[in-house]
Protein backbone atom coordinates (compact mmCIF):
# COMPACT_ATOMS: atom_id res chain seq x y z
CA UNK A 1 0.00 0.00 0.00
CA UNK A 2 1.29 3.42 -0.93
CA UNK A 3 1.95 5.87 1.84
CA UNK A 4 3.92 9.01 1.44
CA UNK A 5 3.88 12.64 0.51
CA UNK A 6 2.82 12.09 -3.13
CA UNK A 7 0.71 8.93 -2.73
CA UNK A 8 -2.76 10.51 -2.98
CA UNK A 9 -3.39 9.54 -6.62
CA UNK A 10 -2.37 5.90 -6.01
CA UNK A 11 -4.50 5.68 -2.85
CA UNK A 12 -7.51 7.13 -4.67
CA UNK A 13 -7.14 4.75 -7.64
CA UNK A 14 -6.78 1.72 -5.33
CA UNK A 15 -9.89 2.76 -3.42
CA UNK A 16 -11.88 3.13 -6.67
CA UNK A 17 -10.72 -0.30 -7.81
CA UNK A 18 -11.52 -2.13 -4.58
CA UNK A 19 -14.96 -0.54 -4.18
CA UNK A 20 -16.20 -3.02 -6.79
CA UNK A 21 -15.63 -5.82 -4.26
CA UNK A 22 -18.47 -4.31 -2.20
CA UNK A 23 -21.66 -6.04 -3.37
CA UNK A 24 -23.94 -3.14 -2.48
CA UNK A 25 -21.77 -0.65 -4.40
CA UNK A 26 -21.51 -2.87 -7.48
CA UNK A 27 -25.28 -3.53 -7.59
CA UNK A 28 -26.04 0.18 -7.13
CA UNK A 29 -23.62 1.29 -9.86
CA UNK A 30 -24.90 -1.30 -12.34
CA UNK A 31 -28.54 -0.43 -11.62
CA UNK A 32 -29.39 -4.06 -10.82
CA UNK A 33 -31.99 -3.06 -8.22
CA UNK A 34 -34.11 -1.25 -10.80
CA UNK A 35 -33.61 -3.97 -13.40
CA UNK A 36 -35.08 -6.65 -11.15
CA UNK A 37 -37.72 -4.41 -9.51
CA UNK A 38 -41.27 -5.13 -10.78
CA UNK A 39 -42.18 -1.45 -10.20
CA UNK A 40 -39.11 -0.41 -12.24
CA UNK A 41 -37.92 2.09 -9.63
CA UNK A 42 -41.30 3.79 -9.12
CA UNK A 43 -42.54 4.34 -5.53
CA UNK A 44 -46.01 2.96 -6.30
CA UNK A 45 -47.77 0.99 -9.00
CA UNK A 46 -51.28 0.08 -10.13
CA UNK A 47 -52.43 -3.44 -10.78
CA UNK A 48 -55.38 -5.79 -11.12
CA UNK A 49 -56.13 -8.31 -8.36
CA UNK A 50 -55.88 -11.87 -9.71
CA UNK A 51 -56.64 -13.82 -6.52
CA UNK A 52 -56.64 -13.68 -2.74
CA UNK A 53 -54.00 -15.79 -1.03
CA UNK A 54 -53.22 -16.67 2.58
CA UNK A 55 -49.52 -16.83 3.38
CA UNK A 56 -48.25 -18.57 6.50
CA UNK A 57 -46.06 -16.49 8.81
CA UNK A 58 -42.52 -17.66 9.53
CA UNK A 59 -41.59 -19.27 12.85
CA UNK A 60 -42.04 -18.60 15.76
CA UNK A 61 -45.28 -16.90 14.69
CA UNK A 62 -48.34 -18.84 13.67
CA UNK A 63 -50.77 -16.96 11.45
CA UNK A 64 -52.16 -16.81 7.96
CA UNK A 65 -51.44 -13.35 6.59
CA UNK A 66 -54.00 -12.16 4.06
CA UNK A 67 -52.41 -11.17 0.76
CA UNK A 68 -53.42 -10.71 -2.87
CA UNK A 69 -51.74 -11.64 -6.16
CA UNK A 70 -51.60 -8.53 -8.34
CA UNK A 71 -50.74 -8.17 -12.03
CA UNK A 72 -49.15 -4.80 -12.68
CA UNK A 73 -50.65 -2.68 -15.46
CA UNK A 74 -47.35 -1.12 -16.62
CA UNK A 75 -45.51 -4.35 -17.44
CA UNK A 76 -47.75 -7.35 -16.73
CA UNK A 77 -45.52 -8.69 -13.94
CA UNK A 78 -47.21 -10.51 -11.05
CA UNK A 79 -46.43 -9.73 -7.41
CA UNK A 80 -47.86 -10.64 -4.02
CA UNK A 81 -49.04 -7.72 -1.86
CA UNK A 82 -49.99 -7.73 1.83
CA UNK A 83 -53.36 -6.30 2.92
CA UNK A 84 -52.75 -4.40 6.18
CA UNK A 85 -55.59 -3.91 8.64
CA UNK A 86 -58.16 -6.02 10.46
CA UNK A 87 -60.61 -7.41 7.89
CA UNK A 88 -58.98 -5.46 5.06
CA UNK A 89 -59.12 -8.46 2.71
CA UNK A 90 -62.93 -8.30 2.72
CA UNK A 91 -62.82 -4.94 0.91
CA UNK A 92 -60.76 -6.36 -1.95
CA UNK A 93 -62.33 -8.48 -4.67
CA UNK A 94 -60.86 -10.12 -7.74
CA UNK A 95 -60.50 -7.79 -10.75
CA UNK A 96 -60.34 -4.71 -8.49
CA UNK A 97 -57.73 -2.11 -9.35
CA UNK A 98 -55.30 -1.64 -6.47
CA UNK A 99 -52.36 0.67 -5.82
CA UNK A 100 -49.37 -1.06 -4.25
CA UNK A 101 -46.20 0.28 -2.62
CA UNK A 102 -43.14 -1.23 -0.96
CA UNK A 103 -43.83 -2.84 2.41
CA UNK A 104 -40.86 -1.08 4.05
CA UNK A 105 -38.55 -3.96 4.95
CA UNK A 106 -34.79 -3.73 5.31
CA UNK A 107 -32.97 -2.96 2.02
CA UNK A 108 -36.29 -2.77 0.17
CA UNK A 109 -37.12 -6.39 0.86
CA UNK A 110 -39.75 -8.33 2.84
CA UNK A 111 -40.82 -7.26 6.32
CA UNK A 112 -41.19 -9.21 9.53
CA UNK A 113 -42.55 -12.75 9.34
CA UNK A 114 -43.83 -12.44 5.75
CA UNK A 115 -41.22 -14.02 3.51
CA UNK A 116 -41.43 -13.26 -0.20
CA UNK A 117 -43.97 -10.44 0.16
CA UNK A 118 -42.34 -7.10 -0.65
CA UNK A 119 -45.43 -4.96 -1.29
CA UNK A 120 -48.56 -3.76 0.49
CA UNK A 121 -51.93 -2.62 -0.82
CA UNK A 122 -52.55 1.10 -0.29
CA UNK A 123 -55.68 1.85 -2.34
CA UNK A 124 -58.59 -0.14 -3.75
CA UNK A 125 -60.36 1.40 -6.77
CA UNK A 126 -58.83 4.77 -5.85
CA UNK A 127 -59.94 4.72 -2.19
CA UNK A 128 -57.49 4.32 0.70
CA UNK A 129 -57.62 0.83 2.24
CA UNK A 130 -57.10 2.31 5.72
CA UNK A 131 -60.16 4.54 5.27
CA UNK A 132 -62.22 1.52 4.20
CA UNK A 133 -61.10 -0.50 7.24
CA UNK A 134 -61.88 2.38 9.61
CA UNK A 135 -65.29 2.88 8.00
CA UNK A 136 -64.56 6.46 6.95
CA UNK A 137 -65.07 5.73 3.25
CA UNK A 138 -67.08 3.41 1.04
CA UNK A 139 -65.71 1.40 -1.83
CA UNK A 140 -67.00 2.72 -5.17
CA UNK A 141 -68.85 0.26 -7.39
CA UNK A 142 -67.04 -0.13 -10.71
From Swiss-Prot:
Name of this chain's protein: Small ribosomal subunit protein uS12
Record Pfam families: Ribosom_S12_S23 (PF00164)
Disulfide bonds: none
CDD domains hit by this protein: Ribosomal_S23 (cd03367)
Composition bias, Basic residues: 7-18
The organism of origin for this protein: Haloarcula marismortui (strain ATCC 43049 / DSM 3752 / JCM 8966 / VKM B-1809) (Halobacterium marismortui)
Similarity comment text for this entry: Belongs to the universal ribosomal protein uS12 family.
GO biological process entries: translation
Amino acid sequence: MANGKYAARKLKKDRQKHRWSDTDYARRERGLGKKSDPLEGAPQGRGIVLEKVGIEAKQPNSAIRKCVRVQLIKNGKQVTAFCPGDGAISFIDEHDEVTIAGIGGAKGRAMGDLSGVNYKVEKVNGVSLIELVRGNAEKPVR
